[in-house]
Amino acid sequence: MLGLISGPIAGAILFLQDDNQQLIFVEGPSVSIVTEKIDFELKEEIVIKIINSGTVPLTFNDASYGLRITGLDGVLYYTPMAAQVVSELEPKDEITFVWDQQKLDGSYSLEGRYKITTEGFDPENNKVKKSVVINVLK
């Protein structure tokens, strides 16, 4: 009987979860990247939130909060212009960036898959990193 009840409940929970963009708060160091969706049109603004999803402060080497957008092959397409000052995110704090899909050379991105990455450090100077993949469609 328990299996008959728990099966549909587990299925409903899995159906509601978005594997790419879960925001789960955890004990210890953790960082999350959240976008409003996974699929974007060409030249559509992409709002990117970097969230300290852990319980300890995170430190970043500059005011870009370690944000990098690359192709799946690792080629760098975008990183925000940022002051070279150490930046910190307290637990549950977030910072928002908007990418208009303009690349570092001034041209616009093409359709394809892009990886959004952030990298910071916990109080013990251990690297804390997260990445998500988005699609840019015609």
Predicted features by range, described:
Residues 18-40:
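Low-complexity, acidic Ser/Thr/Pro/Gly-rich terminal tails and inter-domain linkers that flank the onset
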Residues 35-36, 83-89, 104-106, 123:
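Beta-strand-rich interaction surfaces with strong enrichment in secreted/lumenal proteins
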Residues 42-46:
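Structural beta-strand segments of beta-rich domains
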Residues 50-54:
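Asparagine-centered strand-capping/turn motif at beta-strand->loop junctions
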Residues 96-102:
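Exposed aromatic-hydrophobic patches
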